[in-house]
Amino acid sequence: MPQPPVVVALGGNAIAPPGGRNSVAAQFERTEETAWRLVHLADQPLLVTHGNGPQVGTALLRSDLAAEVVPAQPLDACVADTQGGMGYMLQQCLDNAFSAAGRRRPTVALVTRTVVALGDPAFEHPSKPIGGFYEEAEARRRMAADRWVMSEDAGRGWRRVVPSPEPVEIVEEEAIRDLLAAGVVVVAAGGAACRWCAGRTGR
């Protein structure tokens, strides 16, 4: 019977903490620290997943600010962007850490989709906080001017919230299983994966 994989889940806030230095270089530094902590798992099937709250919030904000120059990006495309960028960081840092420890293994970051139900009530009731924190006055200005949905987050300030529908299945599940069986370290389902309503294109 195949050995079950070790699943490691990294929080998006751990890589880009509120109020911290969150440049790409700073996020690389934190990801590198994490990768070194995973070296002892090099002999086991290893699946790494990650959150993306701060990162996808930044991607949406960047899209909103540039909307007069280039077409705005929908949420699912921004999630895919963060899967690619954060997956790249994890690939690089895991490869470097494993190689330095003399335990080199192939690593693959996989853009992952989950099927969700079009009628999921989460679409009408956004609840997942993303991006940075705002003072109440700025949050209310954003809600009025930019039609953001925002809510107060545990006394720390206001944050943008987006829908988080329940996944029905992981589209790439078989590919993930095949990669793990082949000894590949897999980075997958970042940001809980890109939501996809079967039979529909885009959002």
Which sequence ranges carry the predicted segments?
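Conserved mixed alpha/beta catalytic, RNA-binding, or beta-rich assembly cores of soluble enzyme
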Residues: 15, 185-203
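Ligand-binding beta-strand-loop-alpha-helix segment within the catalytic cores
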Residues: 65-185
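Short, ordered loop/turn segments at secondary-structure junctions
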Residues: 11-13, 20, 52-54, 61, ...
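Short acidic, glycine/serine/threonine-rich loops at helix termini
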Residues: 18-20, 57-62, 119-125, 197-201
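N-terminal glycine-/serine-/threonine-rich phosphate-binding loop
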Residues: 1-49, 59-64, 178-183
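Short beta-strand segments
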Residues: 7-11, 49-50, 89, 106-113, ...
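Histidine-centered active-site/metal-ligand motif
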Residues: 50-52, 198
